[in-house]
Regions:
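Conserved short alpha-helical segments that host acidic/polar catalytic motifs at enzyme active sites
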Residues: 9-221, 226-284, 289
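Carboxylate/His-rich catalytic cores and anion/metal-binding grooves
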Residues: 294-302
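Short, positively charged and aromatic/hydrophobic N-terminal segments
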Residues: 2, 6-9
Length: 302
């Protein structure tokens, strides 16, 4: 009866995508999530909201088959004007929650270093958790529980960013729109795209370009916005302290991505050049391991 699940997490990367459209958003959502497949190989999910039918959700294991194959059926059967989804290297998400805020879906990216303390505090207030895996609470459900400690989504999201020791970016899907919040120190990116009939929020800046969107802007550290098909509203202004994860450029990021206006491919090329200057050798051949190693190798060779 006194069992409290313990977290022993290492860092798990992932990516998310959210879309709001005046028409059906599922096509954009499906391919927007698929463009994040390089960020995870274990689980993926998508959740949509339709004014006519309400919420719908699907989660699949993608260890033995890619996202596009596993979610082909859902891409044809699910419908909605608002949707979020993710590629996750750890927990099953997005999850659906019903609380005093109403029904909402949430997906997160990050690492909660003080999860044990937060779980103990919330359980001590009489709350329980449903999503368990290997004896551990689903981190995304934990974030939802933190948000539910406050009276509204804005205060709840700010509270989650405040109490989490680590990194936390999220998308929250509600009937009124999608909340997008970037980590308080900007460790992981969140970028907004726009097209004629809607908006999107994405981890990767290139994920929506083939879907007809153009760059709107990147969220700043700790910034929170809410958007629907017609507008984007800033709820929490960005902070000034930026500590974006440099490993995005070195390894995680797709070659055509850019973060804070800096191209991943250019950064890797320049890193390769810097390594060559440091080593002061004249090799006969330089080989790069795809994908992240190619630009490093070209920079090193040149």
């Amino acid at each position: 009866l006194n069992f409290v699940p313990k977290f022993t997490y290492t860092i798990f990367m992932g990516g998310f995508f959210g879309a709001a459209s005046q028409t059906d958003c599922v096509f954009d959502l499906f391919f927007g999530i698929d463009y994040h497949s390089h960020l995870g190989t274990r689980r993926a999910g998508m959740a949509v909201y339709s004014p006519e039918t309400g919420f719908d959700k699907a989660i699949h294991n993608i260890e033995n088959a890619p996202f596009r194959t596993k979610f082909t059926t859902e891409s044809q059967s699910m419908h909605g004007t608002l949707g979020i989804g993710c590629i996750s290297d750890y927990e099953a998400q997005p999850i659906l929650v019903r609380s005093h805020h109403g029904t909402f879906a949430i997906t997160t990216i990050g690492k909660i270093n003080n999860a044990n303390e937060i779980v103990e505090d919330i359980i001590g207030r009489g709350t329980h958790f449903f999503e368990m895996q290997n004896g551990e609470v689903n981190p995304t459900e934990l974030v939802a529980a933190i948000i539910d400690q406050k009276e509204n989504f804005i205060d709840g999201i700010r509270y989650a960013q405040e109490v989490v020791n680590g990194s936390l970016s999220m998308l929250v899907l509600t009937p009124r729109g999608i909340y997008a919040a970037r980590d308080k120190l900007g460790r992981t990116p969140v970028v907004l795209g726009q097209k004629e009939d809607g908006y999107c929020a994405s981890f990767e800046s290139f994920a929506y370009l083939n879907l007809g969107y153009h760059d709107l802007r990147e969220l700043g550290p700790g910034e929170v916005v809410v958007f629907d098909a017609d507008h984007v509203q800033t709820l929490v202004a960005p902070g000034k302290k930026m500590k974006i994860c440099t490993f995005l450029w070195v390894y995680y990021g797709y070659p055509s991505s850019s973060y804070e206006g800096i191209s991943v491919e250019s950064m890797r090329y320049n890193c390769g050049r810097a390594l060559a200057r440091r080593d002061n050798v004249h090799p006969d051949i330089v080989a790069g391991v795809p994908d992240s190693g190619i630009a490093h190798a070209i920079g090193y060779a040149n």
